[in-house]
């Protein structure tokens, strides 16, 4: 009787959870007076409570051998963010290696554009495979399990493969991390952070990266000057304005080149500025008086992003911390000289012999950063 009642509670909870997520846009005006950070914290608190009370279970090694030998990738295959590209690169490796796989699109709370449909034919709602590979952070994994229940993971070998950008893990992640049989770490920096907090195997698994030189784009397409040496930086406001540090790029550019020097320019490409009006306004104010700086806050196709990288001359990332640094790596693959902070995930591939590394001094992460 207790089991039947518990299953009923779970089923009812999942129904209302999915209903709330499906109609989230309806509730946004009502929640407008509550800032984004407070809403996010409340949402995660509710999820964590439900996860611990109803769904948490340590992984065992009893597997359903009637399942297909293959892998189900879980994450954001359509999203125009680093996590989306990370999953897509993994899927391309499986394709080239003839590995049987499918993709489950989990767009819980997705606030970024979902315009990359390159893997749409591999999307499926069921899960016939023995192995799950989660391109989801532990808090996102909690939302996934609460939304779909334990059936998606039961009897399967569950691997976590996510990006994290700081040297320590959030304490709230420790419980859901224990759900995985093993964890893959795409950089030594992430491996070091994970290994300090968990007993599960933390395996260094660098991502496969490739980028095709996008043809058909020139500077006129992006309304950029033809006769200047252009430095380039790209970021998502949602990925932490302070961590990505575009203001550092602006300051460094203006200190390095006098305002009368018209032989150089800086291109800043972002998405999500409308969701972070304070940071958006701060950046606009910093560049307002400098006509050499082009600021583009818009959704581009994957081809346009590569095209924009291609027509610029050098990539600059004065980040405070990166889990991997996908944009840095993509620029290097395009043959662009890179200037980057000599710290965090990117030092796996940015070295003193192939990049211009910038010295740094570690500071405490401030509240709200």
Predicted regions and their residues:
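Short hydrophobic beta-strand element within catalytic cores of glycosyltransferases
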Residues: 337-340, 356-357
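Extended catalytic core of nucleotide-activated donor transferases of GT-like folds
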Residues: 58, 72-74, 105-194, 303-304
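Nucleotide-sugar donor-binding and catalytic loop/hinge architecture
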Residues: 60-69, 121-125, 215-231, 258-261
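Nucleotide-activated donor-binding/catalytic signature segment of Leloir-type glycosyltransferases, i.e.
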Residues: 278-306
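Conserved donor-binding/catalytic core segment of Leloir-type glycosyltransferases
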Residues: 72, 224-244, 250-254, 266-268
């Amino acid at each position: 009787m207790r089991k039947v009642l518990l299953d009923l509670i779970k089923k009812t909870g999942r129904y209302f959870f999915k209903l709330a997520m499906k109609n989230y846009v309806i509730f946004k005006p009502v929640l407008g007076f509550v800032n984004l950070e407070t809403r996010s914290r409340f949402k995660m608190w509710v999820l964590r409570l439900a996860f611990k009370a109803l769904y948490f279970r340590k992984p065992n090694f009893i597997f359903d051998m009637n399942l297909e030998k293959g892998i189900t990738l879980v994450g954001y295959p359509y999203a125009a963010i680093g996590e989306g590209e990370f999953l897509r690169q993994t899927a391309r490796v499986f394709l080239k290696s003839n590995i049987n796989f499918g993709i489950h699109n989990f767009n819980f709370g997705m606030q970024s554009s979902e315009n990359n449909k390159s893997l749409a034919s591999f999307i499926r709602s069921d899960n016939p495979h023995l192995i799950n590979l989660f391109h989801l952070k532990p808090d996102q994994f909690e939302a996934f399990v609460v939304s779909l229940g334990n059936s998606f993971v039961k009897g399967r070998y569950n691997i976590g493969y996510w990006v994290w950008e700081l040297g320590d893990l959030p304490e709230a992640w420790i419980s859901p991390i224990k759900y995985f049989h093993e964890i893959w770490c795409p950089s030594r920096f992430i491996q070091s952070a994970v290994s300090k907090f968990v007993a599960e195997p933390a395996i260094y698994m660098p991502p496969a990266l490739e980028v095709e030189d996008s043809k058909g784009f020139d500077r006129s397409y992006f309304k950029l000057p033809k006769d200047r040496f252009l430095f380039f930086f790209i970021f998502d406001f949602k990925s932490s304005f302070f961590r990505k540090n575009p203001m550092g790029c602006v300051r460094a550019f203006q200190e390095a080149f006098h305002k009368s020097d018209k032989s150089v320019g800086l291109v800043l490409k972002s998405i999500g500025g409308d969701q972070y009006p304070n940071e958006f306004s701060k950046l606009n104010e910093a560049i307002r008086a400098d006509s050499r700086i082009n600021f583009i806050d818009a959704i581009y196709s994957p081809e346009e992003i590569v095209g924009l990288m291609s027509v610029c001359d050098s990539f600059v990332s004065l980040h405070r911390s990166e889990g991997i640094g996908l944009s840095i790596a993509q620029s290097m693959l395009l043959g662009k000289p890179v200037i980057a902070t000599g710290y965090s995930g990117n030092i796996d591939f940015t070295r003193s012999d192939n990049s211009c590394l910038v010295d740094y001094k570690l500071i405490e992460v401030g509240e709200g950063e």
